[in-house]
């Protein structure tokens, strides 16, 4: 197990849709261990595999003391609406208000191939949508209004140049 370095915008791995996990290999097991260890830090709600440089459909979460993971997640339902602050480990230092569905449900598998269903409202619902966005090659900045998005991307470019 290892705490992995977080990739930040504009790293291309964050913009590439992740591949489905076709087989549970030792490398996939190590990936899950690394995701769980890396997300296990105060203030971290979720972490997708591409945020640590691996383009596979997997994420870990740490919400209200519940830590876990899901492989090959599919966002199958969302409803309601919430509007609130959102941040991202791959966009350090920036928080913006974003609109998301309040409730979300994701279905995937665990390392033994068993079905996993994660669902929730509020922070859990936001995290499920946020991590599925990552796995599809999107970051939360894509959900911002045009001017806020431009401002955030400018900030990230300037941060990278330093």
Curated annotation (Swiss-Prot):
GO biological process, one term: co-translational protein modification
Database matches in InterPro entries: Peptide_deformylase, Peptide_deformylase_sf
Signal peptide stretch: none
Zinc is among the record's keywords: no
Enzyme Commission code(s) on record: 3.5.1.88
This protein's UniProt keywords: Hydrolase, Iron, Metal-binding, Protein biosynthesis
Catalytic activity: N-terminal N-formyl-L-methionyl-[peptide] + H2O = N-terminal L-methionyl-[peptide] + formate
Bound cofactor: record note: Binds 1 Fe(2+) ion.
Active site: 131
Cysteine disulfide partners in this protein: none
Annotated Pfam families: Pep_deformylase (PF01327)
Transmembrane segments: none
Chain sites annotated for binding Fe cation: 88, 130, 134
Cofactor(s) needed by this chain: Fe(2+)
One term of GO molecular function: metal ion binding
Enzyme class: hydrolase
PANTHER family: PEPTIDE DEFORMYLASE (PTHR10458), PEPTIDE DEFORMYLASE, MITOCHONDRIAL (PTHR10458:SF2)
Record-stated family: Belongs to the polypeptide deformylase family.
HAMAP family, A to Z: Pep_deformylase (MF_00163)
Physiological role: Removes the formyl group from the N-terminal Met of newly synthesized proteins. Requires at least a dipeptide for an efficient rate of reaction. N-terminal L-methionine is a prerequisite for activity but the enzyme has broad specificity at other positions.
Protein name: Peptide deformylase 2
Organism whose genome encodes this protein: Bifidobacterium longum (strain NCC 2705)
């Amino acid at each position: 197990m290892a705490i992995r370095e977080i990739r930040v915008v504009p790293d291309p791995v964050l913009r590439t849709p992740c591949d489905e996990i076709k087989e549970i290999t030792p490398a996939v097991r190590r990936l899950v261990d690394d995701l769980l260890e890396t997300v296990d830090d105060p203030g971290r709600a979720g972490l997708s595999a591409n945020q640590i440089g691996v383009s596979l459909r997997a994420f870990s979460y740490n919400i209200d003391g519940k830590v876990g993971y899901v492989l090959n997640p599919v966002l199958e339902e969302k409803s309601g609406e919430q509007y609130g602050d959102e941040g991202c480990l791959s966009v350090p230092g920036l928080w913006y208000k974003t609109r998301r569905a309040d409730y979300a449900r994701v279905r995937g598998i665990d390392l033994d191939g068993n079905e996993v269903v994660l669902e929730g409202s509020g922070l859990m619902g936001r995290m499920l949508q946020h991590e599925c966005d990552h796995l599809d090659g999107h970051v939360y900045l894509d959900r911002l209004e045009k001017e806020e998005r431009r401002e955030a991307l400018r900030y990230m470019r300037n941060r990278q140049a330093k």
